[in-house]
Regions:
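Flexible loop/turn connectors
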Residues: 1-106
Length: 106
């Protein structure tokens, strides 16, 4: 529905690469050009995103490290330790590919 509004969005950021790729597919079906008419980004940097055109701009997340941190907390909890809610920052990286254009280029 959002893509059918007037004026439509100039960019969409989805919470996963799969959802971002589905937006690109839908945009193409509607006659929109990515990134000329609509910029699209995702999260995860999964391997297959470069198999589609345009190649998806995404945020690479340190999934392995996220699993390590989570497992350490889980093991502490299983060991009977009272674990308080914590916030852990893990570095991430913007991977710029072909699915976005600068606003002044649109």
């Amino acid at each position: 529905r959002l893509l059918r509004t007037e004026p439509g969005p100039s960019a969409l950021c989805r919470v996963s690469d799969i959802l971002a790729l589905s937006v690109i597919s839908l945009a193409h079906d509607m006659g929109l050009r990515v990134p000329e008419d609509l910029s699209v980004t995702g999260f995860d940097d999964v391997d297959y995103t470069t198999m589609f055109h345009p190649h998806l701009t995404t945020v690479a997340q340190p999934c392995y490290e996220m699993g390590q941190v989570s497992l350490k907390i889980l093991l502490r909890m299983l060991g009977g330790e009272q674990v308080s809610r914590t916030h852990t920052f893990l570095p991430h990286k913007l991977v710029v590919r072909e699915s976005v254009a600068a606003r002044n280029e649109l």
